[in-house]
Amino acid sequence: MNAISNRREFLRTAALAGAGLTLSSPLLGTKPKTVLVFTKSSGWEHDVVKRIGGKPCIVDDAVNDLGNKLGFNVGVTKDGRIFESKEFHSYVGVVFFTTGDLTTLGTDGKPPMTVKGKQTLLDAVRGGMGFAGVHAASDTFHTQPDPPDRSNRYIAHGENEDPYLRMVGAEFITHGRDEDPRLQTANVIVNDPKFPGLGGVTSPVSFMEEWYSLKDFAPDMHVILTLDTHTMNGACYQRAPYPVTWARTHGKGRVFYTAMGDRPENWKNEFFLNLLGGGIRWTIGDASAQLEENLKQAAPGYAEIPPKQAPEK
């Protein structure tokens, strides 16, 4: 399918997604792989996933453009019912930019997943479906209980962590505050310059972002990028460098996660888009990578948890 017809189909599926589920794109002659972009916000709704005036959100548009460039089709939805539909099994991979407990209606008011739907997702990934998590995908399905003071997020849960987060590879604790400031330019260390999308990138890379502070890292992960915290401001960064992008296998499935992607302008950044495109391609089997477990080597102090902060009002 050429880019023009693929774009037309994408706009059609995006329009359908406002009311319900999406349709995967047909192909002319062949049948390229199709990924589902899921952007339900049961917690905080980021600007990049807001649909304004019935138009696709920034994330939907950007992933579709990557698909046009890299050769995969895209379906989009905020409707959690899709995970119990026949359509869900037509996708070879999913891209998550989500927040909160997705089994609740939450902030955006879109239909939630069910507990069964969540398990269907987990089983699908373990069975071979690709999963690419972006930014707030680690701020989703927090290990319970998750009280208002967020105290449980400062505890290492290990094998008791929510199974969704165990699949993703880590859990969001918090991020910098406005006075830190919230958005900071920091260096990321490229631990694997051969990972798809990173060809020719030299380390470190300077990048402005709302940097997530993370914990409960999967011990079997292959770290791709590490955040250099030494020059950063804010209590949540008073810790040793830690992973902010990685890949791992989960059963037969491939999981990629990057903590980047908060700011709208970053969805036009070449480094970020190349990284995300490479990650998606790897999760659906269109790109290869050698994944050695390197957590302890890439980030020896990964297990440090920063001092607890009271939630922002």
Task: Give the positions of each predicted feature.
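Catalytic beta-strand/loop cores that center a nucleophilic Ser/Cys/Thr
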Residues: 166, 170-251
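A glycine-rich, often tryptophan-bearing local segment used as a flexible ligand/cofactor-contacting loop or short
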Residues: 101-196
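Short, solvent-exposed loop/turn segments at secondary-structure junctions
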Residues: 42-43, 82, 100-102, 138-140, ...
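Extracellular ligand-binding/catalytic regions of CAZymes and related secreted enzymes
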Residues: 39, 59, 69, 78, ...
